[in-house]
């Protein structure tokens, strides 16, 4: 027996998992941020598929993948390299900031200070200080050396906060010496703080929409901002005003890079264009390239002759930057540069396809998806695997073809935000224990023809996901009883990520199926797993059956109009209509369901006995016909399927029964029917 910690104030929890390959070498969605370690040529990319990947940009090979860094479970919005490339800090929509060993690729610690999506990070290299900000309007300052020293026992960290923001923060920047920090938000203004004192020094107005990207000059005197209003603005902090507005894009500016001398701007936009502009002379500009989708992030290559770009798509491309042949002084005192040809794609890190559409089949075990490359795939939710790759076929036609006329309650939801199928189990709008099915229908590959077992999809799946969890402080099993782990029918892939999170909120715990056996993971599960999970996984409790009330009455052909009184019955919703036929035959009509025996006294009695014996050997569904809404019901249908597809009303389901034409009752049976009808 396990004593599980309970708390009345604990928030409602859900469990989710991702159906994926053991190693996902390609991004499966857009890439939000880039960081290059120029010392070794490693490029770090933060994906909307919740994975940070590391690439070798020094190789000419198409295989640039080095490793994946996995511990987030939602979009990774920003990353910064620190400590000379030894560590990496990441910010995510899962509301966490994580500290990584950049060389070995593992998560060292998780910071849960933010209460909403963490959108942006800023880094002061000279002070080894990082700032984080997000949709909770909060900005926190972190000492990197303290973060990288955190351990399981030394896990307390203090942070300074910068207050005053009145709306969601989408951009953040610091200068290397850490004397200035700037934030941009949906207030459409820039707020400036001194991170040394945590005091706000000014706010700057001028943009008319969200401020999406920021760069601070090394001396802390200038700020360049890009906004959803399509403009780039240059701000002088000493004068506390905008000194220049640059119009080179037709849509929002989402990413900015500055040259080392802070004279040239490389900008990426929602209009898909990447443009180089001279800051003092904005008319001196050139188009680097037009990407295939809105540009999310930019980063220089090692020698700064090119720029890496990411978009809504999963590819990462490096484009050659135009060079300057010669410069001449123009009438305004600026330099007119003669641009060489740029825009050549010099490298490409290919991404994978993101799932864009999903249909849950009526059997509530399989889903069919369509991705950004029009590939259609069938997934087995129960076994957590890809079942069938159908190729570029007609998606709607496949869904229609594979949908059976069966109704099973929804017991999971599907989230496609990361580009991979994430299955969510909970107890709120969709009850993960609502799907009871016969083992013959739900697991035909495990059928024992001698049994009529009913299985619960949600229970089986949770038992498989947490098969390796052995709770701490649990009483050892009786030696005479087997130590039951898993569900006894199947296992799920051991690499499957399992996430425990608050409903509509923060992530509490993430682990792989195979890691649940670890001491720390087991303890964490004990502390965070909701009671409804431990009830079925640890306590082995059986989820309750859902019942359906229904009426049963003779068909008009079976009795006189005044003898149509209805019986009101209640049964488990998953029982098949053949069971209702048996009830009618045995309890209502009082007919024999086994061959009758005994001696006959004359030839008439013998013939009647033979006829009854022959008829009683037939299954009930071959002797009784059920009708609903003037439709003959398939005896293999269950009650919930009849209610959903045939009855289609909010009132109680109603059946009418009658005997089949090839099976006739004698007068005595008719008398029995009349008596039973009166009785009921």
Swiss-Prot record:
Highest taxon of source: Eukaryota
Single biological process term from Gene Ontology: double-strand break repair via homologous recombination
Signal sequence annotation: none
WD repeat boundaries on the chain: 26-65, 71-110, 113-152, 164-203, 206-245, 248-287, 290-329, 350-389
Region (Disordered): 592-616
Pfam families hit by this protein: DUF3337 (PF11816), WD40 (PF00400)
Single GO term (MF): ubiquitin binding
Keyword terms of this UniProt record: Repeat, Ubl conjugation pathway, WD repeat
Its biological purpose: Regulatory component of the Usp12-46 deubiquitylase complex. activates deubiquitination by increasing the catalytic turnover without increasing the affinity of deubiquitinating enzymes for the substrate. The complex deubiquitylates the wg/wingless-signaling receptor arr/arrow, which stabilizes the receptor and increases its concentration at the cell surface; this enhances the sensitivity of cells to wg/wingless-signal stimulation.
Subunit-structure text: Catalytic component of the Usp12-46 deubiquitylase complex consisting of Usp12-46, Wdr20 and Uaf1; regulatory subunit that, together wtih Wdr20, stabilizes Usp12-46. The Usp12-46 deubiquitylase complex associates with arr/arrow; the interaction leads to deubiquitination and stabilization of arr/arrow.
Family: Belongs to the WD repeat WDR48 family.
Protein's name in the database: WD repeat-containing protein 48 homolog
Species whose genome carries this gene: Drosophila yakuba
């Amino acid at each position: 027996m396990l004593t599980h910690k309970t708390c009345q104030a604990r928030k409602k929890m859900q469990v989710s998992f991702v159906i994926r390959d053991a190693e996902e070498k390609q991004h499966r969605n857009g890439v939000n941020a880039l960081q290059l370690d120029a010392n070794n040529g490693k490029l770090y990319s933060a994906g909307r598929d919740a994975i940070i990947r590391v690439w070798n940009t020094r190789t000419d090979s198409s295989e640039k993948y080095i490793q994946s860094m996995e511990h987030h479970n939602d979009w990774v919005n920003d990353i910064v390299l620190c400590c000379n490339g030894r560590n990496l800090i990441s910010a995510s929509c899962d509301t966490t900031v994580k500290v990584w060993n950049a060389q070995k690729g593992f998560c060292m610690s998780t910071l849960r200070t933010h209460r909403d999506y963490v959108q942006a990070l800023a880094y002061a290299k000279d002070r080894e200080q990082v700032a984080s900000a997000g949709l909770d309007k909060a900005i926190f300052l972190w000492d990197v050396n303290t973060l990288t020293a955190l351990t399981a026992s030394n896990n307390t960290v203090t942070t300074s906060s910068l207050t005053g923001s009145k709306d969601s923060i989408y951009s953040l920047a610091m200068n290397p010496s850490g004397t200035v920090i700037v934030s941009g938000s949906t207030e459409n203004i820039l707020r400036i703080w001194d991170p040394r004192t945590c005091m706000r020094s000014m706010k700057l107005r001028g943009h008319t929409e969200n401020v999406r990207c920021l760069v601070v000059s090394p001396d802390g005197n200038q700020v360049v901002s890009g906004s959803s209003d399509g403009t780039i603005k240059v701000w002088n902090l000493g004068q506390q005003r905008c000194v220049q507005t640059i119009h080179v894009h037709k849509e929002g500016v989402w990413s900015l890079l500055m040259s080392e001398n802070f004279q040239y701007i490389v900008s990426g936009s929602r209009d898909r264009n990447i443009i180089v502009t001279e800051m003092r002379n904005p008319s001196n500009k050139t188009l680097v390239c037009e990407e295939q989708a809105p540009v999310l992030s930019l980063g220089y290559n090692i020698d700064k002759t090119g720029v890496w770009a990411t978009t809504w798509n999963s590819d990462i491309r490096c484009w050659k930057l135009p060079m300057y042949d010669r410069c001449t002084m123009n009438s305004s005192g600026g330099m007119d540069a003669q641009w060489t040809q740029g825009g050549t794609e010099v490298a490409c890190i290919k991404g994978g396809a993101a799932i864009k559409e999903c249909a849950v089949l009526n059997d509530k075990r399989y889903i069919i998806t369509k991705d950004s490359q029009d590939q259609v795939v069938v997934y087995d939710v129960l076994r957590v695997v890809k079942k069938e790759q159908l190729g570029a076929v007609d998606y709607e036609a496949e869904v229609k073809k594979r949908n059976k006329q069966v109704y099973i309650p929804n017991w999971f939801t599907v989230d496609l935000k990361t580009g991979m199928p994430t299955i969510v189990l909970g107890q709120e709008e969709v009850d993960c224990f609502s799907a009871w099915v016969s083992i013959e229908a739900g697991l035909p590959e495990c059928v024992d023809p001698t049994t009529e077992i009913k299985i619960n999809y949600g229970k089986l799946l949770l038992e498989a996901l947490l098969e390796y969890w052995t709770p701490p402080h649990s009483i050892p099993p009786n030696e005479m009883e087997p130590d039951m782990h898993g569900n006894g029918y199947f296992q799920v892939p051991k690499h499957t990520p399992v996430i425990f999170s608050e409903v509509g909120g923060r992530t509490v715990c993430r682990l792989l199926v195979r890691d649940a056996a670890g001491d720390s993971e087991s303890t964490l599960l004990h502390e965070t797993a909701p009671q409804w999970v431990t009830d079925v996984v640890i306590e082995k409790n059986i989820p309750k059956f859902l019942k359906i009330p229904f009426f049963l009455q003779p068909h008009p052909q079976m009795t006189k109009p005044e003898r149509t009184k209805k019986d009101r019955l209640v049964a488990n919703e998953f029982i098949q209509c053949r069971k209702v036929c048996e009830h009618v035959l045995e309890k209502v009509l009082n007919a024999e369901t086994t061959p009758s025996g005994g001696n006959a006294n004359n030839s008439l009695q013998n013939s009647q006995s033979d006829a009854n014996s022959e008829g009683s050997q037939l299954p009930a569904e071959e002797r009784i016909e059920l009708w609903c809404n003037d439709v003959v019901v398939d005896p293999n249908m269950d009650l919930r399927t009849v209610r959903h597809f045939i009855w289609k009303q909010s009132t109680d389901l109603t059946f009418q029964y009658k005997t089949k034409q090839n099976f006739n009752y004698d007068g005595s049976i008719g008398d029995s029917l009349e008596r039973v009808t009166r009785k009921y």
